[in-house]
Amino acid sequence: MTSRRRTDHLERTASVHRQMELFSARVCDIISESDTVKRLRLEVAHPDFSFRAGQWVDFFIPGVDTVGGFSICSSPGLLKREGAIELAVKYARHPPAHWIHTECSVDSQVAVRVGGNFYFDPQPSNPVVDLLLVAGGVGINPLYSILLHAADLHRHTHSHRYTPGHTHLCYSAKNTTELLFKDTIIDICHERPDKFSCHFHVTQQSSDIEPQLQPYTIRGRISAEELQRYVDPERTLCYLCGPPPMIEKVSSDLQSTGLPEDRILFEKWW
């Protein structure tokens, strides 16, 4: 989710479930994820703060009237281990994103409130599912959180008692420089090639694709044929996040493979 447009985030998500409590947070690191995206690490010290993989935060900035809405791109495991969450925010003139890119610094104080009905939070008694994650542009953020959570579940099966099946990520961007988190995504696929796979799609790549990305990268949009290969109507649970036209096209393609509509979950970014 993004606060990219002028449409008010709180108004747009008024009917969506969110927590009641606001939590103070401190910016403890800022990383340039790409030429246009900054990744913030926020320390949230309160022991009651929690979120599910895929959810977003209302983002309150002192002195800025507009409230932002940004998907959490880190896993619940990072919060448990280090007391931190991460947000990856693309540059925009919308006040919260503009503040992050032009004024935010380490030790800046903000406040966050968790919300969203789009998440992956399996319980030990749930049936095993294969995950199909389909992202367009910065729609990768909540899906990256879900991917990291799935990887954590595979690493720590002894403590959670739920292990997902196979996870495949389809991630489309204009070019390879705009593919966020690509190195970590590839590392996860290398770590457990039996459980994780990915395809990067580039739609406006003008240069040669870097050698290390070539095995994973396809020129052109995500196709119905690729989706078909990763769909089992009885096991697959699909999460989509991206611009509305992509969501509509991919949802239609998935339903044509026989995947039930209630197994296709999506969040549109504006």
UniProtKB/Swiss-Prot annotation:
Q: What Gene3D superfamilies would the database entry show? A: Nucleotide-binding domain of ferredoxin-NADP reductase (FNR) module, Translation factors
Iron-sulfur keyword on record: no
Q: What is its EC number?
A: 1.-.-.-
Which InterPro entries would you find in this protein's record?
Answer: FAD-bd_FR_type, FNR_nucleotide-bd, Oxidoreductase_NAD-binding, OxRdtase_FAD/NAD-bd, Riboflavin_synthase-like_b-brl
Q: Where NAD(+) is bound, by residue?
A: 137-142
Keywords, comma-separated and alphabetical: NAD, Oxidoreductase
**Secretion signal, residue range per the UniProt entry:** none
Q: Which Pfam families match?
A: NAD_binding_1
Superkingdom of source:
Eukaryota
Entry protein name: Oxidoreductase NAD-binding domain-containing protein 1
Report the gene name.
Answer: oxnad1
